[in-house]
Amino acid sequence: MLNPQILDPLTETQLKDLIGCFENNSMMKSYPGRQFALDLVDAVDIVKDIIDNALGKDSWTVAGGNFFKTEVGYRVHADTGRDGPDNVLQTFVFPLEQEFRQGLVQVNPNRNRLLILKQQWKGPAAFFLHGEETEPNEYNVVVRDYEQEGVIGLENANYLDPLLVDYCPHLNMENFRGLSVDQQFIWIPGIPMTFPRNRLHVSSAFPRYGIRSKLGLSIFTSKK
């Protein structure tokens, strides 16, 4: 698998066409503060060459993904799906838009970030919720005892990464015990990024910095 990294920019046409795929999507799901579009056929055609360049032609298949438009920062999670640890490859994230708030909040788009952690997970897609009893009604399983349940590469059990404390105040700080940041990427529309599907990752508290919402595309790849 490839280390977390930025990829070559989308063309203006690719960016426009991907936004159109979201806006005209036939499979939409809405939740409070979040909206997902699940029909990826046309989107995969648009970005196929980008993924081929990263992974090699005919070496990968699409295992899942979605368009997402969100007004809230997301939890610590892993995109492992249910393929089994030997099949997962990369997550590809394509930032498409961000909308800024008007008014009193000072806008700071540099605080809109995706943080990729050093820790790995070999189980099914999961949220990592050490220190809280929340039970999200979503596809992902919930992991609370990181050491006992098999999170790989943990720091000391009491460790709190200052980057997570700084960028993610929307979450319970206890979620971050033993976790550490490997890479952090600023959310720039048109600049794709990739990281291994088994890596834990989390978004920053972007609404606190004048960003109303962000739109992106995630594609999860597995070995062919």
Regions inferred by a protein language model and the residue ranges of each:
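Catalytic core of non-heme Fe(II) oxygenases with the double-stranded beta-helix
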Residues: E71-R199, S204, R208-K224
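Non-heme Fe(II)/2-oxoglutarate
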Residues: M1-A78, Q102-N110, H130-G153
